[in-house]
Design a protein with these regions (language model features):
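Active-site machinery of serine-nucleophile hydrolases
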Residues: 1-27
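Short, proline-enriched alpha-helix->beta-strand connector loops that line the catalytic pocket
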Residues: 6-9, 85-90
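Active-site nucleophile loop of the alpha/beta-hydrolase fold
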Residues: 16, 71-79
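Gly/Ser-rich "nucleophile elbow"/oxyanion-hole loop immediately N-terminal to the catalytic nucleophile
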Residues: 19-50, 62-64
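Short acidic capping loops at alpha-helix termini that bridge into adjacent secondary structure
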Residues: 40-43, 68-69, 120-121
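Short beta-strand immediately N-terminal to the catalytic nucleophile in serine-hydrolase-like folds
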Residues: 46-48, 73, 93
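Short glycine-enriched nucleophile-adjacent loop
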Residues: 53-64, 70
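C-terminal catalytic histidine-bearing segment of alpha/beta-hydrolase fold enzymes
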Residues: 89, 93, 97-163
Length: 163
């Protein structure tokens, strides 16, 4: 956005002053936006880096039905959320030289999601030669946005013939 990229939607960027992310507060924010703005429920995305990536996976793990897709950069999460995370398109990205949040944190989540659901739509990208701060550039590249905006939540259809 800062570099002139037009985002086809509403961008909300909550900041965390201290403590940890509260997925319930984020849900309240999303529901407020849906009530007060024209929000396409088939296109709700979340992404974050570092502590924001932990918050992304925490929220997506608790409320996967509220999202279309998620991107977590240089973060990690709770493997107990892996089965819920396996239900949405997810892109994990991590620098292989990250000393602040070791790459094993993203790898652990990827492995747990694939263990829960081998066909899960989860991608793990290692950014070669990048430390924690160097992966911030991903927010300035088209690949992440192109991938996110290509994701559209499909309606869940009820099959009454299986009663």
């Amino acid at each position: 956005m800062e570099k002139g990229r037009e985002i086809p939607g509403i961008v909300v960027a909550p900041q965390l002053a201290k403590g940890s992310w509260n997925p319930d507060k984020l849900l309240e924010l999303i529901e407020y936006l849906q009530l007060n703005y024209c929000v396409d429920a088939k296109r709700i995305y979340i992404c974050g880096m570092s502590l924001g990536a932990y918050g992304t996976l925490h929220f997506a793990g608790k409320y996967p039905n509220k999202l279309t897709a998620a991107v977590a950069i240089c973060g990690g999460g709770n493997v107990k959320d892996s089965c819920n995370l396996s239900t949405i398109p997810l892109w994990l990205q991590h620098g292989d030289l990250d000393k602040l949040v070791p790459i094993k944190e993203s790898q652990k989540m990827y492995d747990a999601i694939k263990k829960c659901e081998p066909n899960a739509d989860v991608t793990f990208t290692t950014i070669k030669g990048a430390n924690h701060s160097q992966v911030e550039r991903l927010f300035h590249e088209d690949a992440m946005y192109d991938w996110l905006f290509s994701q559209v939540k499909q309606p869940v259809l009820y099959d009454h013939t299986k009663e």
